[in-house]
């Protein structure tokens, strides 16, 4: 039996991970969880799975949960803040950590978990975006496996199995194109948060839904793929595939292209990461090839969806430039959702930050965290 912690248990990936655990009750024990504000769902999870440790990152919610746990006589330790997240990620008794928190907050607990020798099922792509060099070095030094939970990176990983890594010609990273595929810049001027949150294929949280609409999500995945698979940026090609059936592909030097196909359901890559290297039965719908009428592919429009272009530029420049890109994007998404900035201002402000801040510093935990704070403060003061 594998013992696991889930960081971000009440979010989209967290709750789908719980679905996998319910289906494989004999295979996993949930030891630790973290959440932010959703105390009602957290209480339901505590009652169902009986985790020993619960970390809450929101102060009022933490106090409320402490009282609820005590009043109902539940046996779990409730911990507050970043200290709590790190504790849940580094528990001696766990084997694997599912990092499904959104944003920079996942960096420190993930790095500390790696230093403790815990395998990582990584759904928090920002960790590799802002500190890929540091994270992959730590993983190698500590003998830790980093198993991608993103459907695209899971597909690439599966397509690499049994093949020589040095025979890769290119990675073909698929993208649905988001809800605004085919739009012009003029069309995007009137985009509202409500429209941007409606993704055509995937059910996701707010932040990743906006990122998917701007193609920043794909840009972050390009940087993530660079670090996970040690692949130059010039050999990572984004392919728009609206049906979201092919989750990504690897083209080899002999011309062969190996792909992983499946229904668009995050429980598939979650389960693959948790069970690796084994394959087990799944609660998800199986792919019916006879129901697929067509598989189409097109190039992304980098002039209209500038965030993807900016992500490639940040990745190529390296050092702390991806930290600037990520921090600026997180704040811009928040401001857009709160209707403080327009949709088209998102790439404009990100580019402004990339041209404003010094990125040419060593990638350390402190440097990443400090620069991230500077970028966020700059945007809040100017645009909030």
Swiss-Prot record:
Keywords linked to the UniProt accession: Isoprene biosynthesis, Manganese, Metal-binding, NADP, Oxidoreductase
A Pfam family hit: DXP_redisom_C
Key word Iron-sulfur present: no
UniProt-listed SUPFAM superfamilies: 1-deoxy-D-xylulose-5-phosphate reductoisomerase, C-terminal domain, Glyceraldehyde-3-phosphate dehydrogenase-like, C-terminal domain, NAD(P)-binding Rossmann-fold domains
Pathway(s) it belongs to: Isoprenoid biosynthesis; isopentenyl diphosphate biosynthesis via DXP pathway; isopentenyl diphosphate from 1-deoxy-D-xylulose 5-phosphate: step 1/6
A biological process term (GO) from this entry: isopentenyl diphosphate biosynthetic process, methylerythritol 4-phosphate pathway involved in terpenoid biosynthetic process
Signal peptide: none
Binding site for Mn(2+): 150, 152, 221
Cofactor names: Mg(2+); Mn(2+)
Database matches in InterPro entries: DXP_reductoisomerase, DXP_reductoisomerase_C, DXP_reductoisomerase_N, DXPR_C, DXPR_C_sf, NAD(P)-bd_dom_sf
Catalytic activity entry: 2-C-methyl-D-erythritol 4-phosphate + NADP(+) = 1-deoxy-D-xylulose 5-phosphate + NADPH + H(+)
Enzyme Commission number, as recorded: 1.1.1.267
Enzyme type, top EC level: oxidoreductase
Keyword RNA-binding found: no
Gene Ontology molecular functions: 1-deoxy-D-xylulose-5-phosphate reductoisomerase activity; manganese ion binding; NADPH binding
UniProt: 1-deoxy-D-xylulose 5-phosphate binding residues: 125, 151-152, 176, 199, 212, 217-218, 221
Residues reported to bind NADPH: 10-13, 37-38, 124, 126, 205
Residues in coiled coil: none
Its biological purpose: Catalyzes the NADPH-dependent rearrangement and reduction of 1-deoxy-D-xylulose-5-phosphate (DXP) to 2-C-methyl-D-erythritol 4-phosphate (MEP).
NCBIfam families from the UniProt entry: Dxr, PRK12464.1
PANTHER family: 1-DEOXY-D-XYLULOSE 5-PHOSPHATE REDUCTOISOMERASE, 1-DEOXY-D-XYLULOSE 5-PHOSPHATE REDUCTOISOMERASE, CHLOROPLASTIC
Family: Belongs to the DXR family.
Stated name of the protein: 1-deoxy-D-xylulose 5-phosphate reductoisomerase
Organism: Clostridium perfringens (strain SM101 / Type A)
């Amino acid at each position: 039996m594998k013992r696991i912690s889930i960081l971000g248990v009440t979010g989209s990936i967290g709750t789908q991970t719980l679905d996998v655990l319910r289906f494989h009750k004999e295979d996993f024990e949930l030891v630790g969880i973290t959440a932010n504000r959703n105390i009602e769902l957290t209480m339901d999870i505590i009652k169902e799975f009986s985790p020993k440790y619960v970390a809450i990152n929101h102060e009022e919610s933490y106090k409320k949960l402490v009282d609820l746990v005590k009043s109902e006589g539940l046996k779990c330790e409730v911990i507050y803040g970043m200290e709590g997240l790190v504790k849940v990620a580094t528990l001696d008794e766990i084997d694997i950590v599912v990092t499904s928190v959104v944003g920079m907050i996942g960096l420190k607990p993930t790095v500390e978990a790696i230093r403790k020798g815990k395998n990582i099922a990584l759904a928090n792509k920002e960790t590799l975006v802002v500190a890929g060099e540091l994270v992959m070095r730590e993983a190698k030094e500590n003998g830790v496996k980093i198993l991608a939970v993103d459907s695209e990176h899971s597909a690439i990983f599966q397509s690499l199995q049994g093949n020589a890594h040095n025979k890769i010609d290119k990675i073909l990273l698929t993208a649905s194109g988001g809800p605004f595929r085919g739009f012009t810049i003029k069309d995007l001027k009137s985009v509202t948060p409500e429209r941007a949150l409606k993704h055509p294929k995937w059910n996701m949280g707010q932040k990743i839904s906006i990122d998917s609409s701007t193609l920043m999500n794909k840009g972050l995945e390009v940087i993530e793929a660079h670090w996970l698979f040690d692949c130059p940026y010039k050999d990572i090609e984004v392919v728009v595939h609206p049906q979201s059936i092919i989750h990504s592909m690897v083209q080899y030097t002999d011309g062969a292209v190996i792909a992983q196909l499946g229904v668009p359901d995050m429980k598939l890559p979650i389960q693959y990461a948790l069970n690796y290297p084994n394959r087990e039965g799944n609660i998800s719908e199986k792919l019916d090839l006879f129901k697929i009428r067509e598989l189409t592919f097109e190039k992304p429009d980098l002039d209209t969806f500038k965030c993807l272009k900016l992500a490639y530029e940040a990745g190529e420049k390296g050092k702390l430039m991806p930290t600037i890109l990520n921090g600026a994007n997180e704040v811009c998404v928040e401001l857009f959702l709160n209707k403080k900035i327009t949709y088209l201002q998102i790439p404009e402000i990100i580019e402004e930050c990339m041209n404003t801040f010094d990125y040419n510093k060593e990638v350390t935990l402190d440097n990443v965290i400090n620069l991230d704070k500077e970028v966020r403060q700059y945007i809040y003061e100017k645009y909030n």
